[in-house]
Swiss-Prot record:
The keyword Oxidoreductase applies. Keywords: Cell membrane, FAD, Flavoprotein, Membrane, Oxidoreductase. It comes from Bacillus subtilis (strain 168). The lineage of its organism: Bacteria, Bacillati, Bacillota, Bacilli, Bacillales. This is Glycolate oxidase subunit GlcD. Its main location: membrane. Residues 37-216 form the FAD-binding PCMH-type domain. It comes from the Bacteria. PROSITE patterns: FAD_PCMH (PS51387).
């Protein structure tokens, strides 16, 4: 609850034009991309700089007002839903690329910068920022940092955490700290930079970031390998890595996903295949040619019924964009789409896909599976209808078993989507009580009044998913 006095203090900081507690204004920021989940904030505020954020947090801390930082709301874990009301903090005024440093190979950016805008800006300088979440046309760098976003290129290049080398962060009490910098080496104290990345706004508010860049790859090449057997496709993934080839992307799609994407994108995908591997390599011309020849041979030896190489950049782009459209394509099928990201060692891909299919059959639900096979990050996606309570109960039970299986195979409940509120009930399955207690101690140290994105990471009831009861 934001009292009249607190409202007046906040408006003094941001100006009345950047504070909104109208019903319409609050409604817009009551939900994110998480299926059928909504919670109203008490107000929305859009500060113009770090100093204003510091003053806002000082006020919120004094009056115990929850505050939820929000980028574009593309997360899939309820991470930016204001579950306990309070204040939603927007970064629409803090959306500048402050510097592209070609000598130190870094970019300094504000959190509201759209991911793809930054990628294009650095590419115009002959540089490359590899993390490429499927939401990059919409998502912000700040959101990527809070979720430690991955993407298709994670196998070769890593994820967001691997590129964030410095941060400006406002703590819960309003203090401003800087971590890291434009440095290749820095072991001064605890690695706070990596701690804040992926913390989902629960430890501090990121107001500026320094990210590492690399030279833009000279060229790239894409191929599509078709399989009549999912096990053969999964084994090919392991065989490629065992051959000491690390592709830029190594994506897996099962037949149900393939059918839906082709109906959506209409680019001539071969829908008769039981599984598809979409593989891209980048780098120097000679290296790409050599690697793709080897990859093609491995695919054929691994019982691929067809291996097709994109003949033009346009064709390669169409294939990659079709893969990125998977969620949009699946979302057309039924009113509710639940996309998860159970992740296993890549040697267990075949076992995990088989388990997902068996679990879907057991509970009589529809699950399409696709994902980043090269790093074991699968996206089992259920199309359903939240109004069908009986089916939703079966969906909940199915995903609980999928997460259990992932952990049994040496994996995790989330590879890149984050925990938020939706996956918090399952976190103890992965970390055990001792791990949760350690995280709670960190949270208490950074945010003793629990005002930073409360209700996220830590579940009130373990293994009771919120989506089933809303």
């Amino acid at each position: 609850m934001i009292t009249k006095d607190v409202k007046e203090q906040l408006i003094q900081v941001s100006g009345p034009e950047n504070f909104d507690d109208s019903n319409a204004g609050r409604l817009v920021y009551s939900y994110d991309a998480t299926p059928q989940y909504q919670s109203m904030p008490d107000a929305v505020i859009a500060p113009r700089n770090t100093d204003e954020i510091s003053r806002i947090l000082t006020i919120c801390s004094e009056h115990r007002v929850p505050i939820v930082p929000r980028g574009s709301g593309t997360n899939l874990c309820g991470g930016t839903c204001p579950t306990e009301g309070g204040l939603v903090l927007l970064f629409k005024h803090m959306n500048q690329i402050l510097e592209i440093d070609e000598e130190n190979l870094t970019a300094t950016v504000q959190p509201g910068v759209i991911t793809l805008d930054m990628i294009r800006a650095v590419e115009s300088k002959g540089l490359f920022y590899p993390p490429d979440p499927s939401s990059m046309k919409i998502s912000t760098i700040g959101g990527n940092i809070n979720e430690n976003s991955g993407g298709l290129r994670g196998l070769k290049y890593g994820v967001t955490r691997d590129y964030v080398i410095g941060l400006e962060v406002v703590l819960a009490n309003g203090d401003i700290i800087r971590t890291g910098g434009k440095l290749a080496k820095d072991v001064a104290g605890y690695d706070l930079t990596r701690l804040f990345v992926g913390s989902e706004g629960t430890l501090g508010i990121v107001t500026e970031a320094i990210v590492k860049l690399v030279p833009k790859p000279e060229t790239k090449k894409t191929l599509l390998a078709l399989y009549e057997n999912i096990d053969a496709a999964a084994q090919t993934v392991s065989d490629i890595i065992a051959a000491k080839i690390i592709p830029a992307t190594l994506e897996f799609l099962d037949q149900p996903t393939l059918l839906v994407i082709e109906d959506y994108a209409k680019i001539g995908l071969p829908t008769s295949a039981k599984a598809v591997l979409l593989i891209e390599q980048d780098g120097p011309f000679e290296t790409v040619e050599r690697d793709m020849e080897k990859i093609e041979a491995i695919c054929k030896k691994g019982d691929a019924v067809s291996v097709q190489t994109a003949q033009t950049e346009e064709e390669a782009f169409a294939l990659t964009e079709a893969r990125r459209s998977a969620l949009s394509a699946l979302a057309r099928l039924k009113p509710t789409t639940i996309l998860e990201d159970a992740t296993v060692p890549r040697s267990e891909i075949a076992n995990m896909v088989k388990a997902i299919n068996d679990i879907a059959a057991k509970y009589d639900i529809s699950i399409c599976t696709f994902g980043h096979a090269g790093d074991g990050n699968l996206h089992p996606t259920c199309t359903t209808d939240i109004r069908n309570k009986d089916e939703m109960e079966r969906v909940e039970q199915a995903f609980a078993e999928i997460f259990e299986k992932a952990i049994e195979l040496g994996g995790t409940i989330t590879g890149e989507h984050g925990v938020g509120e939706m996956k918090a009930p399952y976190l103890e399955m992965k970390l055990k009580k001792e791990g949760i207690d350690a995280m709670k101690a960190l949270k208490a140290a950074f945010d003793p009044r629990n005002i930073l994105n409360p209700g996220k990471m830590f579940a009130k009831d373990a293994r009771k998913r919120v989506v089933a009861e809303r």
